[in-house]
Amino acid sequence: MPPRSPLLALVFLAAGVLSSATSPPPPPCSRSCAALNCDSVGIRYGKYCGVGWSGCDGEEPCDDLDACCRDHDHCVDKKGLMSVKCHEKFKNCMRKVKKAGKIGFSRKCPYEMAMATMTSGMDMAIMLSQLGTQKLEL
């Protein structure tokens, strides 16, 4: 029997699109540090982290993890949301932040929790990006 993970990924993607269609639109950009939904796909961390969220041009990141998110935002703006290289660079940036042993700006949303959530999100994005570039045989 063929693996069902591509079908499952499409179901999750469709669910995400539908849920985002019913939620209010995000503000145009963020000027304040946020720490919301840290253990879910709807995470908001710092000014730049989270699907659909970004800091305003020229805004300093809240911490090193938020800087990784800013750099990822810039990368996907240039190369597109399907850029696996952007997602891999983001994961590498998070690994460096973790290795440095610093503490983030939020006690409510510690690095360990936020990074685990973001890593899962990037793994899903990489899988969907790769799925979108493969030729399917019928």
From Swiss-Prot:
Superkingdom of source: Eukaryota
InterPro entries: PLipase_A2_dom_sf, PLipase_A2_His_AS
Active-site residue numbers: H72
UniProt GO cellular component terms: extracellular region
Keyword set includes Signal: yes
Signal peptide (from-to): 1-21
Entry's localization field: Secreted
Presence of keyword Disulfide bond: yes
An individual GO BP term: pollen development
Main subcellular localisation: secreted
Cofactor: Ca(2+)
Alphabetized GO MF terms: calcium ion binding; lipid binding; phospholipase A2 activity
PROSITE patterns: PA2_HIS (PS00118)
Residues that, per the record, bind Ca(2+): Y48, G50, W53, D73
Entry EC number(s): 3.1.1.4
Catalytic activity: a 1,2-diacyl-sn-glycero-3-phosphocholine + H2O = a 1-acyl-sn-glycero-3-phosphocholine + a fatty acid + H(+)
Record text on cofactor binding: Binds 1 Ca(2+) ion per subunit.
Record family assignment: Belongs to the phospholipase A2 family.
Biological role: PA2 catalyzes the calcium-dependent hydrolysis of the 2-acyl groups in 3-sn-phosphoglycerides. Releases lysophospholipids (LPLs) and free fatty acids (FFAs) from membrane phospholipids in response to hormones and other external stimuli.
Protein name as annotated: Probable phospholipase A2 homolog 1
Gene: PLA2-I
